[in-house]
Amino acid sequence: MGEVGRRLAGALERAGVDVVRVTRAAGWEQTLSADAGARIVCVGETQLAAVVERLRSVPPESLVFVQNGWIRPDLAAVAGHTRGLVWFTSKGEFFRSLRPSLFAGPLAVDMAAVLSAGGIAAEALDDAAFRAAEAEKMGFNCVVGLPLAVHGITLAEYVTRHLAEARAVFDEAAAVTARALGVAADPGWWADFLLAAEPLGWVKSGAPKALAYRNGAVVALARRLGLDAPINLRLLAAVAAG
């Protein structure tokens, strides 16, 4: 089980929820049972489409997806699900909640309540507020990843040495995603990013992951919408060039 799943499962158990840990090879019989409760899907973005297909017999209202990035196309077939945006970071024994994690959908209130009871701050949002939060989180994810890999430095070093580029990556990602979701980007998001990122100054990125769901998705959405995302495009080109 990955870090996100491990932390969520632990919080649920501390709140008194019975948790069945599901892996690629184990736990699926109970997951697909009509008697099962909520199913929280914690796989990486690149694995999501295959898991959604495997869950096709499960009622969408019992599904909770906590992936980052532009995953809406992968979830089109399961309308009525619950989405979560995780705002904590976990690596081994290290855990830090940066902000309350956010949920929207039929299980949002329950998820927020039990996770908060289990020690992970969480809130339920309506659809419009969640869309705005999704755009803001895309800005965060596009900075904390690809640019660090391109420059080979930590997040603190990146924000110090390349502040204008970091701001451009964030603003492009947030603005494009906000337009795609029909919400307005908030100029205050950048200041909030700097506050949330401060405890993560040590973070580095090796080979960037899931770019098609993050910076790559921003560039693709920008093209579709007639917008520009030149800094994200340049960083993607740098990775492609090796």
Where are the regions a protein language model picked out?
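Rossmann-like NAD(P)(H) cofactor-binding subdomain of soluble oxidoreductases
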Residues: 1, 5-13, 24-97
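Generic structural signal for well-ordered, non-membrane alpha-helical segments
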Residues: 5, 104, 108, 135, ...
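Hydrophobic anchor at the start of a short beta-strand
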Residues: 16-20, 61-63, 122-123
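Rossmann-fold dinucleotide-binding core
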Residues: 64-137
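Helix-loop-beta segment of a Rossmann-like dinucleotide-binding subdomain
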Residues: 89-100, 151-160, 198-205
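Active-site-proximal catalytic alpha-helix in oxidoreductases
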Residues: 130-174
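NAD(P)-dependent Rossmann-like dehydrogenase/reductase catalytic/cofactor-binding core
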Residues: 170-242
